[in-house]
Amino acid sequence: MTDAMPPDDVRVVVYGKPGCHLCDDAYAVVEQVCAAVGAGWRAVQIQDDPELMARYGEQIPVTFVDGRQHDFWRVDADRLRAALA
């Protein structure tokens, strides 16, 4: 997978990998905000995709909203909520 275009019901995609504490923090924020606004989200584990690792490995977690890069390293709940409004 090389693009961030989500299925119709998923507006937020978070690229991360296991063992990444910033990813765990991002998943928690994204889950909370998406639940509050009724938006779907999913996590994409990049460790098995060399292209994604090369592109995003130093920036994870990387958050996309509606197919466009929104944040990396940390997710600001207010900024994410505004992007989903």
Where are these predicted regions, by residue range?
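Short Fe-S-cluster ligation motifs
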Residues: 48-62
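Thiol-/selenol-based redox modules, centered on thioredoxin-like
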Residues: 80-85
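Thiol-based oxidoreductase modules, predominantly thioredoxin-like and allied folds used
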Residues: 39-50
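A short, hydrophobic beta-strand/beta-hairpin element that forms part of a small beta-sheet core
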Residues: 61-69
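Conserved strand-to-helix beginnings and helix N-cap segments that scaffold or border functional pockets
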Residues: 24-27, 53, 77
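Local sequence-structure signature of Cys/Sec-based thiol-disulfide redox active-site neighborhoods
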Residues: 3-32
